[in-house]
A protein has these predicted regions:
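Glycine-rich flavin
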Residues: 2-7, 24-30, 35-174, 207-211, ...
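Rossmann-like NAD(P)H-binding beta-loop-alpha module
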Residues: 172-214
Length: 230
């Protein structure tokens, strides 16, 4: 391990909030180290927001093709190739990673792919993915630790080896039947996408209606439920 280095700012976690904070600090000429364990740029461009929208776009095209005859276009024999859907998604993620690497490679900013551990007051040890470690004492330490998918404690569910959104985005074949537990926006967008690909889908929602964002009002559940069936 090298000697402990003093630095003005350390951001633990390079996800959505942390990366923009780090970029702004660096632009102001204020030294900052970003320590990220695995996903450059966080969940959104790697395993969540953007990849899911990429897959949803493919599903929208599949749905349009399935209704092409109503537009006077014949598309007999068209099929969904999930390997191709996944490859398109992966290429988008690779492109986003290239963009993030460039944005992190700026003056006053150092990006470390490492596991960060708090080992003392405002002191972080970065265990580097490539081996070795470094230690920093920061004037300001920002925690941007993010979230992770969890499996609810439903009896027997863990034994069924369920998928989270992370694994669902990596499927290379269509399941004959997909059960989605939870009718929130993530569950519904996956449900509709796979239905449009041709999978039979069942959504299990614990409430009496599909949840809706507070700003949308109670009127949103009915049209969302209707559109999810198409």
């Amino acid at each position: 391990m090298n000697q402990t280095l003093h630095i003005e700012n350390v951001v633990l976690g390079g996800g959505e909030a942390g990366k923009y904070l780090a970029w702004d600090l660096a632009q102001e000429g204020r030294p900052v180290v970003v320590i990220e364990r695995a996903l450059i740029g966080g969940s959104c461009p790697n395993i969540a927001c953007l990849p899911s929208k990429n897959v949803i776009r493919s599903a929208k095209v599949a749905d349009l093709v399935s209704r092409a005859a109503s537009y006077g276009v014949r598309t007999e024999g068209a099929t969904v190739d999930m390997t191709g859907v996944r490859q398109r998604k992966r290429e988008m993620v690779d492109g986003m990673m290239a963009i993030h690497r460039r944005k992190f490679a700026v003056p006053h900013l150092e990006f470390l792919l490492a596991e960060g551990l708090l080992v003392g007051p405002r002191t972080v040890e970065a265990r580097l993915a490539e081996g070795g470690s470094r230690r920093f004492v920061a004037d300001r330490l920002f925690l941007n630790l993010g979230t992770r998918a969890t499996i609810p404690g439903i009896p027997g569910l863990a034994d069924a080896r369920p998928l989270t959104h992370v694994e669902a985005l990596e499927l290379d074949r269509l399941p004959s039947h997909l059960i989605v537990i939870g009718g929130g926006y993530v569950g519904v967008e996956f449900a509709q996408a796979f239905r449009r690909f041709g999978t039979q889908v069942t959504v299990l929602e614990f409430g009496t209606q599909l949840p809706q964002p507070p700003e949308s009002g109670p009127w949103a559940s009915a049209p969302v439920a209707h559109n999810s069936r198409t």
